[in-house]
Regions:
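Short beta-strands and strand-loop turn motifs
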Residues: 188-192
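Phosphate-binding loop of NTP-binding sites
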Residues: 12, 179, 197, 208-217
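C-terminal helical cap/extension that packs against the catalytic core
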Residues: 125-184
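Extended acidic/charged loop-beta regions that coordinate divalent cations
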Residues: 1-32, 68, 72-75, 79, ...
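Short, solvent-exposed loop/turn segments at secondary-structure boundaries
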Residues: 199-202
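Short, charged/polar "capping" segments at the starts of alpha-helices
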Residues: 6-9, 120-121, 144-149
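Nucleotide phosphate-binding/pyrophosphate-handling subdomain across enzymes
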Residues: 30-134
């Protein structure tokens, strides 16, 4: 498959959709906008899957699945869309590299909830990623100060870009992230840290986040 060019035989992207070209000719299978999961890698995952099942699974079934599948739990999992704001649970992101990967999935600046147990790892590489991909950073836990310092010391940082808020508790962090959201915003829990300062594991942390988000009205 190819995202860059049309193929005589295979799966490719054309005019914002995934197409298949085979012995029956070329046809549009899935608009990229119809994929619920964010990120180029998910487009490529669907391309590979479509190539494997083309001719075996009807195209309308593929479209229905793509529009409904929210992803694997705690891995950039779409929790809810409320008043045009999308909330994602990426609690498995317990290191800067995982959070970086999550941020790069979105084509817009996001509202990020980060921080947690201090594993004594550097956040230098995360700072520039937050400057590039985050509009508001909400910090909690023992690593809040370290992450803040990494962001404020990153190239391109200017006061208020992103806005940085430190909170006293996980619940306060989620509330602050949700405050003043507008339709089209993305709020993501992607801590870049382990959960042991407050939770038994990343799953418990992710479930706590989801409970709070589902309780919003």
């Amino acid at each position: 498959f190819s995202r860059k060019r049309e193929l005589e035989r295979g799966v490719y992207v054309k005019d914002g959709s995934i197409w298949v070209s085979d012995e029956r000719g070329a046809r549009e299978v899935l608009p990229i906008g119809g994929i619920l999961l964010p990120g180029v890698h998910n487009v490529e995952n669907y391309m590979a899957a479509i190539g494997a099942v083309s001719g075996l699974v009807p195209d309308d079934v593929i479209r229905e699945f793509a529009a409904a599948f929210k992803g694997v739990e705690h891995r950039i999992e779409l929790v809810r869309t409320l008043r045009g704001v999308r909330y994602y649970n990426d609690s498995i992101a317990s290191s800067p590299s995982r959070t970086t990967a999550g941020l790069r999935c979105f084509d817009q600046p996001v509202i990020l909830i980060a921080g947690g147990y201090d594993k004594h790892i550097p956040f230098d590489t995360l700072g520039p990623e937050i400057v590039s991909h985050v509009k508001k950073l909400v910090l909690t836990g023992p690593t809040a100060g370290k992450i803040r310092a990494a962001v404020e010391g990153a190239p391109g940082y200017a006061p208020g870009r992103p806005e940085i808020v430190e909170t006293d508790s996980f619940e306060d962090a989620v509330a602050e992230a949700n405050r003043e959201t507008v339709p089209g915003d993305v709020v993501i829990l992607s801590p870049a840290c382990a959960s042991f300062d407050r939770f038994k594991n990343f799953m418990e942390r992710g479930n706590a986040f989801k409970e709070i988000i589902h309780a919003l009205d």
